[in-house]
């Protein structure tokens, strides 16, 4: 009888340990390199300068996720500020732009709380704020000045997968597509211009995560 009781306790412990971080009421965060790859385009004067280019940039990405149920999560994406070089085919690099694109997602996780591999999809909203934008010497020599960008709201979509190492630790990969449309305000030769700009980036992130 004693051996049976010990075995039952061991089995209970094993089964209780099979629940992982992705279950109702859990909170976890991920951290890792996040790369923004714009699929850019522009109208107005910028759109006529033989192409409009925005460089890729990689920063520290952070996500914070709360599991409302075993399958439904709410996630906030944050990051250190992204720094992009902006240029055209006619001028080369002409400016540097800094931005932050915090994104709030509603997610559906496939599988259940005992699954070690949890693919997921998400939809949500992105807010992008621009700051510390300035023309470099190339831009200034071309008569450009007073650069600013209008903050943007847009939709976002996401796919990803987590591999749960144990109850507390996980590794994962995720991809977002963000609708980021803004207006570039600047002066050329002292004349004010307002050009529409489309960034619409893909964001790629590889991460390690921890449950709190």
Swiss-Prot record:
Keyword Membrane belongs to the record: yes
Signal peptide: 1-21
Localization (cell): Cell outer membrane
Transmembrane segments: none
S-S pairs: none
Keyword DNA damage set for record: no
Keywords recorded for this protein, A-Z: Cell outer membrane, Membrane, Signal, Transmembrane, Transmembrane beta strand
Lineage top rank: taxon: Bacteria
Major site of localization recorded for this protein: membrane
InterPro entries, sorted: OMP/PagP_b-brl, OMPW
GO CC terms: cell outer membrane
Gene Ontology terms describing biological process: transmembrane transport
Membership in a protein family: Belongs to the OmpW/AlkL family.
Protein name: Outer membrane protein W
Native organism: Salmonella typhimurium (strain LT2 / SGSC1412 / ATCC 700720)
Gene that this polypeptide is encoded by: ompW
């Amino acid at each position: 009888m004693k051996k049976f009781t010990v075995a039952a306790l061991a089995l209970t412990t094993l089964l209780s340990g099979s629940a992982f971080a992705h279950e109702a009421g859990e909170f976890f965060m991920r951290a890792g390199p996040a790369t923004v790859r714009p699929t850019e385009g522009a109208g107005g004067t910028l759109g006529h300068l033989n192409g409009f280019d925005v460089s890729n940039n990689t920063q520290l990405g952070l996500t914070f996720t709360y599991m409302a149920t075993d399958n439904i999560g709410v996630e906030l994406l944050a990051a250190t500020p992204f720094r992009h070089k902006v240029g055209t085919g006619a001028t080369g690099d002409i400016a540097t732009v800094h931005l932050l694109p915090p994104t709030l997602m509603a997610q559906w996780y496939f599988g259940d709380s005992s699954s070690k591999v949890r693919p997921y999809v998400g939809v949500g909203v992105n807010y992008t704020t621009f700051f510390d934008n300035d023309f470099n010497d190339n831009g200034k020599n071309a008569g450009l000045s007073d650069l600013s960008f209008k903050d943007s709201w847009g939709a976002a979509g996401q796919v990803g997968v987590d591999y749960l190492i144990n109850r507390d630790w996980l590794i994962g990969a995720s991809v977002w597509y963000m609708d980021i449309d803004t207006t570039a305000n600047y002066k050329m030769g002292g004349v004010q211009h307002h050009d529409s700009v489309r960034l619409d980036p893909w964001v790629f992130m590889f991460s390690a995560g921890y449950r709190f």
